[in-house]
Design a protein with these regions (language model features):
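N-terminal membrane-entry
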Residues: 224, 277-293, 415, 805-820, ...
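Extracytoplasmic/periplasmic
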Residues: 1-58, 62-65, 95-123, 144, ...
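Hydrophobic transmembrane alpha-helices and their membrane-interface caps
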Residues: 265, 292-301, 305-361, 401, ...
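Signature of alpha-helical transmembrane segments and their immediate interfacial
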Residues: 381, 452-504, 905
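Helix-loop junctions and hydrophobic alpha-helical segments within the transmembrane domains
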Residues: 269, 276, 280, 284, ...
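Membrane-proximal extracytoplasmic
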Residues: 1-291, 301, 408, 574, ...
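Transmembrane helices with small-residue packing motifs
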Residues: 16-17, 53-62, 327, 331, ...
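Transmembrane alpha-helices and their membrane-interface boundaries in multi-pass membrane transporters
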Residues: 345-359, 381-401, 408-454, 566, ...
Length: 984
């Protein structure tokens, strides 16, 4: 009832994507509100707080007393710190650990920039009053008497002062009155007087209760590698930098450790930033490898260190300029910006290679000076460079305007790549010609006829070029027939693309896994701990596992005695082979616990993008959209999960949450209670204090205000009979047993109620079986969910929601990229036919990318789409190099066919050189291993496949498309005089 009121107030919040509320049987509730990426978190928090403020008028007083807390934080844990005793320490009780962490560590970490929330897996100390109900009855006392006595005798006393104004003018001294009203330790609390008897004897608290300095809450405990510990999980604030925040947290922990007691130590057993650190380091290595390979390709073709040096100088200058712009835009060095840099290496050298190769060719053919050759070369290639630069930078612009989380992924990649390409084009028109004119030396005619390895290479390449030119002349002569082949390739592209399995991002080996432990409903903590110990023993036997942090009483599904969550962290990627990958370890654990002795133990891969869900795979919310009731919703859940169990497309699927559990229903005869003079408020207060716990007030412990908590002693709350043995006071002050007006019965009931976007719902999570993508599993899930009874609906959430958004945007993304490139070429060439002949080559590159990904068993994910957009630009680039020259030759009076064949021959060498440089620059991505390897391979494989087809098929089809299209449209060249004046 409370959360439904709050949910109503949240509807209409600006930037709201979805919200989910979780109501627990313990009386707590949480609403997680998710906003669109890019929403200002501070404004969103203020908006939510204002909406909740308006709803407070409809809140019960108990809720207002406890208060509503609003926090802004990202989902998922960034890291977990653990505080434990050193080996050989005298102490072993975790109460002191939890209290020390609460006093000296947690708040220090909460204050750090980037920390949104700290989830503490323990509690600070409290004065625990363990009541013996039987002793209370023996003294004729009730739990209310205990509560009232503590409240009355543990108080702050502001006694005032003597001699203070107004007073006598002769008063010369004032002083405050100090009265010790608060109690400080178990001995003092034990002296609290519950009753004074007529004979002068006293009944004290110590007579009916055991007092100790214990934990405020015993609901959650944790272990590190089997050793009791306390820990805290850090969650990022929205928009915070994970690496920076993790570094600050670890630095602060190191500083605080200097003040730890001698027998305490800390560790960070779980750290998601480690993957990002290592992955970025791997990409930097890939960047260096790409530069070396590109240098070797350039040296192979240019065969002179000076020639090779020029593009090698241009690349760092471009990257430096790109980093400067990224800094000004507030971008960070992350996986996507680094991917952009790696792809840029091969693209950046293109413009410089085109200039240098043309200068070198002119000097070799005509024997003129470097300065003269540079001037002549720039007249020939300036138009092509401008076209290539504009096309390659423009093709990435649509990526920057994508919505959702995928837009965030695309934005930094596209902007960093587009900026670097613009710098490359600018330098190719200014800096590169200057370097050519000053660094290059004159070379004699016939330079390519030298002896040795390079001479053999040049002669071999010349023969290939001549054969290519001969083949081109034959193909162009039959352009119409080969356009039918082209149409077949386009049809093949559409066929294979539609059969690519859909996914959002590839599953990564993040260096850890998540293990969810769920025992049967109603299972005790003892049973949960036993299963946890069995899990720890298994993980200890695995060579790949470095450490295990286990939390009992807590899971992403909810809190309860039958729940636990483990975070096994693996050794470094360099120390593990393929047989010890995260996927292999997850499979081994799930196989070992396939038939557990007690409950279920399920290992899942973490989400590849931290903050989008608790695990990889898919996440669905089954919803009661028509008020059919909880029973119908549960039946739909069982039907759906039953269908999935026998479906080969699913590895697993399960309900994420706490299942229905045994409940002891107390049937209170209110008429009897009223007749006996017992109020319902007294009944509820006694029950919650005895079987739950009740916070009475605070006491001062070592300078910190901590709570006084009362609860029945453990042995007096273990059985159903102990409920009926409780006594409550009536209006006359006499004790009445609950059994006089209460009966009990067993039933099953929910311990957790979940609502999604205001509808009763059930969380269902799962993953695709090997050989199937998450997109295929989600499509199958939608098919099965559509067969459920009327009134039952579903919605995707987390990573799955973003995957659906991404899939819906793909078509418009590609169409917009092609349209932008086409319109740019139309404006550049002031023609419709020439841009069309360039754009016809795009499918030729795309088919190579699709086939490469399909043969590799990969999916149509975000990284593949990034690669495909890149191929659109690069395919157009190769076509522009040929079409630009063909257009000039055609305008000079050559026939359409001769112009196309000659342009293809002249541009064959730079196209092969630039394409090979790009392909070799991307090979380290396609062959990546270790942290981030899946993402690198996903982007590298498609790009290499696309570039191979765009190069080796493209050089054949560009002349064909050019001749066929211009012949079909009967275009005429511009007059020679006009072309000449345009050249001037």
């Amino acid at each position: 009832s409370v959360t439904s009121v709050l949910e109503e107030s949240l509807n209409g919040a600006r930037g709201l994507l979805y919200f989910e509320s979780t109501n627990n049987s313990t009386g707590t509730a949480e609403i997680v509100v998710t906003f669109e990426p890019g929403t200002d978190p501070d404004l969103a928090q203020v908006d939510v707080q204002n909406r909740l403020k308006k709803a407070e008028a409809r809140m019960p007083q108990a809720v207002l007393t406890q208060g509503l807390q609003v926090e802004q934080t990202s989902a998922g844990f960034l890291l977990i710190y653990a505080l434990s005793y050193k080996e050989g320490a005298q102490r072993s009780d975790t109460t002191a650990l939890g209290d020390y962490a609460a006093r000296n560590i947690n708040n220090e970490l909460r204050r750090l920039p980037g920390v949104g929330k700290l989830q503490f897996f323990s509690s600070e100390a409290a004065m625990r009053v363990w009541i013996d109900p039987q002793k209370l009855v023996g003294f004729g006392l009730s739990i209310d008497d205990v509560s009232n006595a503590i409240r009355g005798q543990n108080v702050q006393v502001p006694a005032g002062a003597f001699g203070s104004a107004p007073g006598s003018s002769a008063q010369e001294l004032t002083a405050t009155l100090a009265v010790k009203g608060t109690l400080d330790d178990p001995q003092e609390f034990g002296q609290v007087v519950l009753r004074a008897n007529q004979d002068g004897s006293l009944v004290r608290l110590a007579d009916v209760a055991r007092l100790e300095l214990g934990k405020e809450s015993y609901n959650i405990s944790s272990r590190l590698n089997g050793t009791p510990t306390v820990g805290g999980a850090i969650q990022l604030s929205p928009g915070a930098n994970a690496i920076q925040t993790a570094t600050l947290v670890k630095q602060r922990l190191a500083e605080l450790s200097a003040f730890f007691p001698e027998d305490m130590q800390y560790s960070v057993p779980y750290d998601t930033s480690r993957f990002v650190d290592v992955a970025i380091e791997k990409v930097i290595h890939t960047l260096i490898e790409a530069m070396v390979l590109v240098f070797l390709v350039m040296f192979l073709f240019l065969q002179n260190v000076r020639y090779t040096l020029i593009p090698s100088i241009v690349v760092p200058v471009c990257l430096l300029g790109t980093l400067m712009v990224m800094y000004l835009l507030g971008f960070s060095v992350n996986m996507m910006t680094m991917f952009g840099m790696v792809l840029a290496i091969g693209i950046l050298v293109d413009d410089a290679i085109v200039v240098v190769e043309n200068v070198e060719r002119i000097m070799a053919e005509e024997g003129i000076s470097p300065a003269e050759a540079t001037v002549k070369a720039m007249k020939q290639v300036s138009g092509a460079i401008v076209g290539i630069t504009l096309v390659l930078s423009a093709v990435f612009l649509p990526l920057a305007f994508m919505a959702g989380s995928v837009g965030v992924i695309y934005q930094q990649f596209s902007v960093s790549l587009a900026v670097s390409i613009l710098f490359s084009g600018f330098l190719a028109l200014t800096f590169t010609p200057a370097l050519c004119a000053t660094l290059l030396k004159p070379i004699p005619e016939g330079h390519h006829e030298k002896r040795g390895f390079f001479g053999a290479f040049n002669r071999g390449f010349a023969r290939v070029t001549e054969r290519y030119s001969l083949l081109n002349s034959k193909l162009v002569a039959r352009a119409g027939r080969f356009m039918l082949v082209y149409a077949g390739l386009v049809a093949m592209l559409g066929y294979f693309y539609l059969r690519l399995p859909e996914a959002f991002v590839p599953a990564e080996d993040l260096g850890y896994m998540v293990v969810d432990v769920q025992l049967p409903p109603g299972a005790s903590r003892v049973r949960t701990d036993a299963t946890g110990e069995e899990l720890e023993r298994f993980l200890k036997s695995r060579e790949a596992v470095a450490s295990v942090f286990l939390i009992s009483g807590f899971s992403f599904s909810g809190q309860g005695d039958n729940a636990a969550l483990a975070f096994p962290t693996f050794k470094d990627w360099s120390e593990r082979g393929a047989e010890q990958s995260a996927a292999a370890e997850i499979a081994a654990l799930n196989e070992h616990f396939a038939l557990p002795d007690d409950g279920t133990v399920m290992a899942v891969s973490p989400p590849p993008i931290n903050g989008l869900g608790n695990s990889g795979g898919f996440a669905l919310r089954l919803m009661d959209r028509s008020g059919v009731g909880r029973e119908a919703l549960l039946q739909a859940r069982d039907t759906l999960l039953g269908e999935i169990q026998t479906n080969p497309k699913f590895l697993y699927a399960m309900m994420e949450g706490l299942a229905e559990a045994p409940q002891l229903r107390l049937l209170i005869d209110r008429e009897k209670a009223r007749a006996l003079g017992v109020s319902f408020e007294t009944i509820s207060g006694t029950l919650s204090a005895a079987f739950g716990s009740e916070v009475i007030n605070d006491f001062t412990n070592a300078g910190r205000q901590q709570r006084v908590v009362i609860q029945a002693e453990q042995g007096n709350r273990m059985t159903p009979e102990s409920v009926l043995e409780l006594y409550v006071p009536n209006a006359a002050g006499n004790l009445v047993p609950l059994s006089a007006f209460v009966s009990v019965k067993w039933e099953e009931g929910p311990v957790q109620l979940v609502r999604y976007n205001g509808y009763p719902s059930i969380r269902i999570v799962g993953d695709a079986a090997p050989g199937f993508s998450t997109g295929e599993a989600m499509a199958e899930m939608e098919r099965l969910a559509a067969q459920l009874p009327a009134g039952i609906g579903y919605e995707w959430t987390g990573l799955s929601y973003q995957e659906k958004v991404s899939a819906g945007q793909a078509t418009s993304l590609f169409a917009l990229a092609i349209l932008v490139v086409f319109l740019l070429l139309v404006a550049l060439y002031e023609s419709w036919s020439i841009p069309l002949s360039v754009m016809l080559i795009v499918p030729i590159g795309a088919i190579g990318a699709v086939l490469a990904v399909m043969v590799s068993g990969m999916s149509n994910d975000v990284y593949f789409k990034v690669g495909l957009i890149t191929i659109i630009g690069l395919s157009a680039k190769n076509a522009i190099l040929i079409v630009e020259f063909a257009k000039e030759l055609w305008e000079q009076g050559h026939s359409l066919r001769d112009a196309a064949i000659e342009a293809a021959r002249l541009r064959f060498r730079p196209i092969i050189m630039t394409s090979m440089a790009f392909i070799l620059g991307v090979i380290p991505l396609a062959l990546a291993s270790g942290a981030g390897a899946a993402s690198q391979r996903a982007i590298g494989t498609g790009v290499i496949g696309g570039m191979l087809s765009a190069t080796f098929l493209g050089v054949l089809f560009v002349p064909i498309c050019f001749v066929w299209l211009l012949s079909l449209l009967r275009s005429k060249p511009a007059p020679i005089e006009q072309a000449a004046s345009a050249g001037e």
